[in-house]
Amino acid sequence: MNQHTDNQQLPPAILLMGPTASGKTALAIELCQALPCEIISVDSALIYKGMDIGTAKPTAEELAQAPHRLIDILDPVQSYSVAEFRRDALAAMQDITQRGRIPLLVGGTMMYYKALTDGLSTLPQADPLVRAEIEKQAEKNGWQALHQELQGIDPVSAQRIHPNDPQRLSRALEIYRISGKSMTELSLNKQPSAPYQFSQFAIAPSDRHILHDRIAQRFDIMLNSGFEDEVIELKSRADLHLDLPSMRCVGYRQMWQYLDGENIYQEMREKGLAATRQLAKRQLTWLRSWQNLHWLDTFSKDNLTNVMKLSRIRT
């Protein structure tokens, strides 16, 4: 009973999740017009400046209607950990709440949401891309060099892990690269869940084929809106390459490879669509196992009413 009472006393926050191309932005703007909400973006691609078309970043008109926080905060050469998102989102949520308004968190990066609702796990889950990058470095420089890198990052773990133990050495480095914190530091501290009463919603079409059609339609709009020129401009920079998190965003890698002559235009389009469908599939897999989640159909006329009713927030 005490936990329930405590929950009721926490400030409200709305989570609006969903796969890519499901209609999150349109509904979020409607919510901002009906409720005293302010949007915080929960999207690992929208954080990057100069990556507007391929990420389907909200338009200037949409941003004028409903400003989004945590958009355009980093240069594409920079990386951004889940821990950094959690820190920035909590600061934004506190600012919004202190002004008597409601944080509305909108996006499709599920690890970001989990960091808020469940707290940051003591040790992050394995990331095959980060692991592959570490193994590539090991092939080039040797595990001894990576062990020396670990000594600089986490001397306690380096003392415990032998240079000839690639599995544990790789994991310790992976944890640091994902979270920005050492294994030793994370083992000592676990951040609790964010102190908010969350109302959690997911929006998606009821039919997977409709979602795929929406993905294709949106991808073609991007191609016709200057996406190729956007990537040409990014590619012209000497400091950007395909191993960066920003350039691993769906669509960008495929366009980059097309510009390098690795495939023809139609193949680039097909690979970009396949990567986007895979992203949507992963997002939906996360959401199907999500606890206390209210589902909304993309095409329902009652989504705004249902969010207002189920979140029990009064205007």
UniProtKB/Swiss-Prot annotation:
Residues annotated to bind ATP: 18-25
Highest taxon of the lineage: Bacteria
One Pfam family linked to the record: IPPT
EC number: 2.5.1.75
InterPro entries recorded: Dimethylallyltransferase, IPT, P-loop_NTPase
GO MF annotations in UniProt: ATP binding; tRNA dimethylallyltransferase activity
Region described as Interaction with substrate tRNA: 43-46, 167-171, 248-253
Catalytic activity: adenosine(37) in tRNA + dimethylallyl diphosphate = N(6)-dimethylallyladenosine(37) in tRNA + diphosphate
Keywords annotated in UniProt: ATP-binding, Magnesium, Nucleotide-binding, Transferase, tRNA processing
Record-marked site positions (Interaction with substrate tRNA): 109, 131
Cofactor needs: Mg(2+)
Enzyme class, broadest EC rank: transferase
An example Gene Ontology biological process: tRNA modification
Binding-site residues, substrate: 20-25
Subunit-structure text: Monomer.
Stated family: Belongs to the IPP transferase family.
HAMAP family: IPP_trans (MF_00185)
Biological function: Catalyzes the transfer of a dimethylallyl group onto the adenine at position 37 in tRNAs that read codons beginning with uridine, leading to the formation of N6-(dimethylallyl)adenosine (i(6)A).
Protein name according to UniProt: tRNA dimethylallyltransferase
Organism of this sequence: Pseudoalteromonas atlantica (strain T6c / ATCC BAA-1087)
Gene name of the encoded protein: miaA
